[in-house]
């Protein structure tokens, strides 16, 4: 596949799903794979992978309304807290385990990553782009870390900071 074609395809996936990390993740996933999406939200990525890569997908999401929306899409999504571990899944249950822009929401990130590596052959972790120009501009003009759709917390009330307070 030519670089130009690949760039166009990635742009198309980004346009459809609205996030550049989804485009990159979709390139990494082999068709027909077994995929676990941790913190899957309403299943947008999982649904796209099922439709376009024919993956056998499952998701775990902590937010009840998002779980309901994912299930309404016909996806297999369970409500659960990934900080509690993935004890329901034996070693090597999945080809890919995805943690997309979710690690910063966890209270036990090392445990979450260890569990990903235990249940999956491959782990894919993405992060919000804290260096994006819009984030930098907001920081410059307001003097405060911005709150966005991908970064919904102030620095002092993020889950990892709050977990330190409750030690």
Where are these regions (language model features)?
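Class I SAM-dependent methyltransferase SAM/SAH-binding core
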Residues: 48-85
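A short SAM/SAH-binding and catalytic strip from SAM-dependent methyltransferases
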Residues: 96-107
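Conserved small/polar residues in nucleotide/adenosyl-binding loops
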Residues: 165-167
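A short glycine-rich, Lys/Arg-flanked "PGG" loop and its adjoining helix->strand segment in the class I
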Residues: 110-124
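Conserved alpha-helix/loop element of class I SAM-dependent methyltransferases that forms part
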Residues: 16-32
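Conserved class I S-adenosyl-L-methionine
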Residues: 33-41, 125-148
């Amino acid at each position: 596949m030519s670089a130009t074609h690949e760039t166009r395809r990635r742009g198309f996936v980004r346009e459809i799903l609205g996030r550049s990390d989804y485009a990159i993740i979709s390139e990494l996933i082999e068709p027909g794979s077994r995929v676990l999406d941790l913190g899957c939200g309403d299943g947008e990525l999982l649904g796209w992978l099922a439709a376009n890569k024919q993956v056998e997908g499952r998701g775990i999401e902590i937010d009840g309304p998002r779980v309901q929306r994912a299930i309404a899409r016909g996806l297999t999504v369970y409500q659960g807290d990934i900080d509690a571990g993935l004890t329901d899944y034996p070693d090597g249950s999945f080809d890919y385990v995805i943690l997309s822009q979710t690690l910063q929401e966890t209270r036990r990130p090392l445990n979450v990553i260890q569990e990903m590596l235990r249940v999956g052959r491959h782990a894919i972790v993405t992060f919000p782009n804290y260096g994006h120009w819009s984030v930098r501009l907001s920081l410059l003009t307001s003097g405060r870390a911005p709150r966005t759709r991908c970064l919904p917390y102030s620095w002092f009330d993020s889950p990892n900071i709050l977990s330190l307070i409750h030690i």
